[in-house]
Amino acid sequence: MPSARLTGLSGSQIALRDDDLALAFQNPAHLNSAMHNALTYNQNFLLGGIKSGYFGYGYHLDKIKITFQTGVQFITYGTFKQADELGNVNGEFKASEYAFTLGAGRQINERLSAGINLKYIASQLEAYRSTGLVADLSGAYWHEEKKFGAAVVFRNIGAQLSSYEGNGYTGKKEDLPLDIQIGFTKKLKKAPFRLSALLHDLNRWDMRYDNPLDNETSLLGEAPSEPSKLSQELNNFFRHLSVGGELIFGKTEVVRVRIGYSHQVRKELNISNVRSFSGFSLGVGFKVNRFRVDYGMGRQHLAGGTTHLSISTNFSEFRKK
């Protein structure tokens, strides 16, 4: 996730629309004039000392009514011991990946907008390197009076330019993880609460996998019962769904408290017969002077989870008297 706000909401809530530049990394159709001179920095602390982050800047050209963004997303895996096939350590190596983004979004009419993100991706694992060029295409609908939004994103349309195999550009190319997403968001009329939902990976409907634990016999030697067809279909459907909610304080949303849930994360990483918060996420955000600070925490497994910190501002605010 590019920001702590989205981490707290359990994922890429692509229908959300305001002046948060990090939202445009997930859906460039939300790029708007309020993001002119916006700056965002996001740091994600993952398991095993792995770190990732996103840095972005927005700029609006009023003459052509287009808002642009540029940014870089990174993930560093740390330092590894380098050993031969016999286990003899003969050095160290590092691994990291970067995605350089250039995006643009435009308002088509009062409620419809469209956008595109172009990304150059570079990966380095020891002496092996791979690059790719992808695009995210998106469209969005926003009804200001009803505070309702809907969006669709076609993510990772493109190709691998060079692979880890062979001589880079001549090696075998891999397929990119295409992801078609649909999202919705609604702020309640008489309550300071906003609900968001995302359907992801719609291009690969069956997201179930064979879990060997499902085939284990009980202590009494009884074979496990086969789930019904309806149960399997419902389980698969909810794996595509992630939901999040924001409790809002103040007219300018000075404070936001968040909660989210991902059924896919819970089903794939939760330990059977053990109670845990796998799949749940929490977050809080508040505005201090000209800065907005957000914190998000996602629980993936009993072994731990992720924490996310974001700081954003707008240079235009510093020019106001």
Predicted regions and their residues:
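Subset of outer-membrane beta-barrel
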Residues: M1-K321
